[in-house]
Amino acid sequence: MGEGGTGTRPRLSLAQIVNMNVGFFGIQYSFGLQQGNMSPIYRYLGADEATLPLLWLAGPMTGLLVQPVVGALSDRTLSPRGRRTPYFLVGAVLCSLALLAMPFSPALWAAAGLLWILDAANNVTMEPYRAYVTDRLAPAQQAQGFLTQSAFTGLGQTLSYLTPSLLVGLGMSGDAVNARGIPHITTLAFLLGAVFSITSILWSVRTTPELPLTAAERARIAALPRGMGPALREIADAMRDMPATMRQLAVMKLFQWYAMFCYWQYVVLALARTLYGTSDPQSAGFREAGLVNGQLGGFYNFVAFLSALAMVPVTRRFGARWVHAAALTAAGVGMWMLP
């Protein structure tokens, strides 16, 4: 919120807009670590392939439950540090602790529990972050703010996927493992993620604090009903009033996210079988498949970043519906051919 409403939010320089979005780098680095490493970690700890989808439930379940609830609660929050900052800080601390502990998980149940904490913490941080951009930037700068956020999304995920390969390039052994069979390069990648998660959020909070609310804005928020019940009713009202276009997109997204989770859960296992002829998580071939997946993940995030820019003129010419259909068809063909 601005000091005097929407029209009085001060314009920020490009450097300030970058600073306020640095925290998104840490969030997305953490998500990239999960996508690229959780299935191998589960396999190192003894999980069989059929149980991987159950072990991955933390991601979609916390996204479904935590994001909308935290978004509604943060809209009603009044604190000395602002409306969004408390969620940033709590989420970043929990995320960092979970990342620190993950590669040292003593058993499968511990890793699964830590993933629930990690995903919940990331969602607690991420949902208010989007509102933070709207609160902090004048309407004319909000598109630039979200574009900068998207750039940090691509940077964070690309670097997280490439970190194990970069560590090998710097001289670490890809075959050195701890007592539970988890490679040391994976452990160090998660430790770096813990550092990035907390430091990037602290950087954004310190360099670009929230604007103070006016007395009228504070009075309006204070008058809102408190507690989980009103927040849930607000979510239900939003779903009931959802535009028809969003309802159509929801059906498409159901199948798109099904495909993406199948990819994240099984791509390392597929590469290990196809390229190295092994399904043994303790084999050198399986660890090499994890490195290959990181390189592929870094590449596809880079391609996604370039494609997002290229799609702007293409969409203007051919229309969003046909471009979207062509992109999903290409993705489906790629997934069909990958194994």
Locations of the language-model features?
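C-terminal ends and interior cores of transmembrane alpha-helices
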Residues: P86-A107, T329-P339
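Intracellular loop-helix junctions on the cytosolic face of multi-pass helical membrane proteins
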Residues: M1-A15, P106-G113, V124-Y129, R136-C262
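Juxtamembrane helix-start motifs in multi-pass secondary transporters
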Residues: G82, P86-F88, A189, A320-A326
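Loop-to-transmembrane helix entry
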Residues: A47-G59, L147, H184-L188, G277-F302
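Hydrophobic core of transmembrane alpha-helices in multi-pass small-molecule transporters
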Residues: F25, C95-P128, Y132
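Helix-to-loop junctions at the C-terminal end of transmembrane segments
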Residues: L65-G82, L306-A320
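Helix-loop boundary and gating motifs at the non-cytosolic
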Residues: G2-T62, R247-S283
